[in-house]
């Protein structure tokens, strides 16, 4: 398989530009550490991104990007009953996001910066927990379905729309740095604050209820 990338850039002037990117990527498959578990396959990503980089009056920088990522055979992991990490494939997932970063030279000595991000990361198909004979993750498993091991399931382990693991819905940070001359060099003090929203460790609903 081949991967593609297309990038278009418009340099509005010396201090402002916008860009659009379409790109593809993948993560290789592999074998789980526990030999009785099935191997996991490669997953594939298609990324659509629109962004900008701007400077205003040599004192204010404002950059940002809007993006969508579509995942096929999405890889995710969780801690299994034996204490080993298990990697599985879900059918499909999507991440919509907005990322912003700002910098302001408030005075000659004081620099203020901040970064903010919002993500809507979710499954776009049910995750049932097993693979179909054609190698694709099963997505249809209503209450009463019998899985390949003969167990009757009560529904998908993670339903369409479930938040993806590890990815918070929001994160942000701010930083202030004050610099001054001292003893022929420079000294500074710096203060930072960061926050990240709630994150799921395990995507499966029974494990996070």
Put a short name on every predicted segment:
Residues 11-25, 42-105, 111-117, 121-127:
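Membrane-embedded beta-barrel scaffold of Gram-negative outer-membrane proteins
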Residues 68, 89-203:
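Gram-negative outer-membrane beta-barrel transporters
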Residues 19, 29-31, 60-63, 73-76, ...:
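Extended hydrophobic-aromatic, low-complexity segments
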Residues 2, 44-48, 94-96, 168-172, ...:
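Residues that define the transmembrane beta-barrel architecture of outer-membrane proteins
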